[in-house]
């Protein structure tokens, strides 16, 4: 039997290992031989145990499943009487295994694609918007009113892009981790003392992307609890926090 030099923690799970073995056999997923892939898989697990490497229980469960599928194919079906027809709906099938492998492969390819897109996007920098009010007609009305979740998310996304760009230029990043409750209290105290503040002015002070995420979640929770409200100011994307004065007022942010 072929010796394996790949460590089991290289794979993210039994399906990942199965895809690796199928790839080595150079066959399509739908054309797999259950008996052959079972022998390959069990041989791999036994090699790991031979070298006293820890084998996660999920790998052993998959090995048992493959052996059950192999035995069903090799052994003749057991005849049963009509009145005692068992329910095999929960038993594993070759078709079910193939479906899981196809779905997992599609998931892996999607993850790789999204990571490539993220790396590509981080190499780009969007220049901050300029003040174009001097070029606008006086007849254009300025919007000053409630915001919905999409508006907040758009402004938040712009802050994330800027923060990631700055972090990539730093050799070391000091992370100051805060819980959601701590950030809600901090944001509430800030709004209570200043009565209102600029969205960008407040968020730009966050030390890293992780803190930005927690701060944005804290903002959404305070809006949901009707402690603060948000408004669009003129033609800018800025958002102000205003402490809600009446709990019975109509919600100003749609979550």
Swiss-Prot record:
Keywords assigned by UniProt, alphabetized: Cell cycle, Cell division, Chromosome partition, Cytoplasm
- Report the locations given in the UniProt record: Cytoplasm
On whether Cell division is a keyword of this UniProt record, the answer is yes
Signal sequence, renumbered to the chain:
none
User: Key word Cell division present in the record?
Assistant: yes
User: Which InterPro entries does the record associate with it?
Assistant: ScpA (IPR003768)
One annotated Gene Ontology cellular component of this protein: cytoplasm
Q: Which domain of life is it from?
A: Bacteria
Provide an example Pfam family for this protein.
Answer: SMC_ScpA
GO terms under biological process:
cell division; chromosome segregation; DNA replication
**What function does the entry list?**
Participates in chromosomal partition during cell division. May act via the formation of a condensin-like complex containing Smc and ScpB that pull DNA away from mid-cell into both cell halves.
Subunit relationships = Component of a cohesin-like complex composed of ScpA, ScpB and the Smc homodimer, in which ScpA and ScpB bind to the head domain of Smc. The presence of the three proteins is required for the association of the complex with DNA.
**Similarity field:** Belongs to the ScpA family.
Q: What is this protein called?
A: Segregation and condensation protein A
Organism ancestry: Bacteria, Bacillati, Bacillota, Bacilli, Bacillales
The gene that this protein is the product of is scpA
């Amino acid at each position: 039997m072929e010796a394996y030099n790949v460590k089991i923690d290289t794979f993210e799970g039994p399906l990942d290992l199965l895809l690796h073995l199928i790839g080595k056999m150079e066959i399509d997923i739908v054309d797999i031989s259950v008996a052959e892939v079972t022998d390959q898989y069990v041989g791999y697990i036994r090699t790991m145990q031979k070298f006293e490497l820890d084998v996660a229980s999920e790998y052993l469960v998959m090995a048992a499943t493959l052996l059950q599928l192999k035995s069903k194919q090799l052994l003749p079906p057991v005849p049963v009487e009509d009145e005692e027809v068992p329910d095999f709906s929960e038993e594993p099938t070759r078709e079910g295994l193939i479906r899981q492998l196809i779905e997992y492969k599609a998931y892996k390819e999607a993850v790789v694609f999204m990571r490539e897109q993220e790396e590509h996007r981080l190499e780009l920098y969007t220049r901050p918007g300029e003040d174009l009010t001097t070029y606008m007609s006086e007849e254009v009305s300025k919007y000053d009113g409630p915001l919905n979740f999409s508006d907040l998310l758009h402004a938040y996304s712009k802050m994330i892009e800027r923060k990631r760009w700055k972090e990539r230029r730093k050799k070391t990043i000091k992370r100051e981790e805060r819980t959601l409750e701590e950030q809600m209290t901090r944001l509430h105290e800030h709004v209570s003392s200043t009565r209102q503040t600029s969205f960008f002015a407040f968020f730009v002070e966050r030390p890293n992307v992780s803190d930005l995420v927690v701060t944005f979640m804290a903002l959404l929770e305070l809006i949901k609890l009707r402690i603060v409200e948000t408004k669009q100011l003129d033609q800018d994307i800025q958002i102000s926090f205003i402490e809600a004065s009446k709990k019975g007022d109509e919600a100003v942010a749609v979550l």
